[in-house]
């Protein structure tokens, strides 16, 4: 992945050698497990970022919108996320992209509900995709079936907060690099 820069944003490329995802209900247990792993890996690896993420409001982003509604399910999810068995040594593995996003909550909160819905392309309360969503809407820019070739991945977002700042960690698992290059 090559970094991207625009007039109002910068998305740097930050490749890493190792990524760990620890999950659990007890934050204290996760902290201790993380500390043990960091100590075990310390001779070879130095942590670049540790993010404490969580489930918010039954799977919603901090903006209040339901997350992951367009994820493939069942066999389609397995096919999107994992290298197929016939691939040999890589069978069962995934290519992963991780993005750490910081939300501008004051800016989003200053929008009307209609403006927020248009920004996402869904109605927050019903989770229905808007027929007249603008091309700049999140759902229009991320429709996996609209890429050539189709760019299906299994996506997972995890809200994070530190002090008064927050956002999401976006994780995408793919069976090849193709979806990430679309």
Q: What are these model-predicted stretches?
A:
Residues 1-182:
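Long, histidine/aromatic-enriched segments associated with O2/redox biology
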């Amino acid at each position: 992945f090559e970094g991207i820069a625009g007039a109002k944003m910068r998305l740097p490329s930050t490749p890493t050698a190792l990524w760990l995802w620890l999950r659990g209900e007890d934050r204290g247990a996760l902290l201790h497990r993380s500390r043990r792993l960091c100590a075990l890996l310390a001779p070879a690896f130095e942590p670049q970022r540790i993010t404490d993420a969580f489930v918010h409001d039954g799977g919603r982003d901090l903006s209040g919108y339901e997350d992951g509604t367009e994820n493939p399910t069942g066999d389609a999810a397995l096919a999107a996320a994992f290298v197929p068995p016939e691939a040999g040594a890589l069978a069962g593995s995934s290519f992963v992209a991780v993005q750490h996003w910081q939300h501008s909550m004051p800016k989003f909160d200053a929008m009307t509900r209609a403006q927020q819905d248009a920004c996402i392309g869904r109605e927050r309360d019903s989770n229905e995709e808007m027929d007249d969503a603008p091309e700049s809407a999140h759902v229009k820019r991320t429709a996996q079936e609209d890429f050539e070739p189709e760019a299906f991945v299994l996506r997972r977002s995890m809200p994070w907060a530190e002090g008064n700042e927050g956002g999401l960690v976006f994780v995408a698992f793919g069976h090849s690099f193709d979806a990430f290059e679309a």
